[in-house]
Amino acid sequence: MSDLKKAAQRAIELMDLTTLNDDDTAEKVIELCKKAVTPAGHTAAICIYPRFIPIARKTLIELDAEDIQIATVTNFPHGNDDIAIAVLETRAAVAYGADEVDVVFPYRALMEGDETVGFELVKACKEACGDDVLLKVIIESGELKDPALIRKASEISIDAGADFIKTSTGKVPVNATLEAAEIMLTVIAEKNRAVGFKPAGGVRDAAAAAEFLGTAARILGEDWVTPRTFRFGASSLLSSLLHTLELADAPKGAQGY
């Protein structure tokens, strides 16, 4: 198997296959669940809005694919600084049955100089998740822009108890970049804690996936790159990867994240 095909296979196993569109329906989520059961194996997770968790759980059971985790989003997509609302949304997501919660860090507050609200929000949301539900914190690196702010948001999130740090919501012009990945992965290495990394949005094909995988392996070691500590957040990437593996036709133009 070529290096590109190996990267494609790996990226599928590390993928949070995502639909977070305003026009999502139960039918679209059922289709997403079916797509997550790929000819190359199951994706690590699906990522959907909270209200669709019950139908997704039912569908994954019917597909005999209960190993696929269900991730959802809270404080999404704007990263507001209202801790109470973020916590209530996170509790509701856990009550719905989420295995993982991707919460948006209050990045605009950080840009305005407030480091406290981000820490308190992440800490409270992790408490709402408990030990059994992973908390991934979306720092929105493409809006923070400044490497110092990307580093600071990563440090605050990890110090507050994040299980993962994630680049992006996929709802802003700039999503995952290798520059942001380098900073975020370096912070994880410095913190020396079992914290994962999730590039999301903008990873379009196996070659791009390979670059992110290579960056993670260089900074944290080849053995570190597993579904417990590395995920790709993507919607259009899957069809490109299956094409690379010669398991599907070429995608008809990238749609979405």
From Swiss-Prot:
Active site per UniProt: D102 (proton donor/acceptor), K166 (schiff-base intermediate with acetaldehyde), K198 (proton donor/acceptor)
Entry-linked InterPro entries: Aldolase_TIM, DeoC, DeoC/FbaB/LacD_aldolase, DeoC_typeII
Keyword flag Cytoplasm: yes
Matches recorded under Pfam families: DeoC
Protein EC: 4.1.2.4
Keyword Cell membrane belongs to the record: no
Pathway membership: Carbohydrate degradation; 2-deoxy-D-ribose 1-phosphate degradation; D-glyceraldehyde 3-phosphate and acetaldehyde from 2-deoxy-alpha-D-ribose 1-phosphate: step 2/2
One annotated GO molecular function: deoxyribose-phosphate aldolase activity
Gene3D superfamilies (alphabetical): Aldolase class I
Assigned keywords, A-Z: Cytoplasm, Lyase, Schiff base
Domain of life: Bacteria
Location within or outside the cell: Cytoplasm
Record's catalysed reaction(s): 2-deoxy-D-ribose 5-phosphate = D-glyceraldehyde 3-phosphate + acetaldehyde
Family per similarity comment: Belongs to the DeoC/FbaB aldolase family. DeoC type 2 subfamily.
Record's function text: Catalyzes a reversible aldol reaction between acetaldehyde and D-glyceraldehyde 3-phosphate to generate 2-deoxy-D-ribose 5-phosphate.
Protein name: Deoxyribose-phosphate aldolase
Organism (species): Shewanella amazonensis (strain ATCC BAA-1098 / SB2B)
Gene: deoC
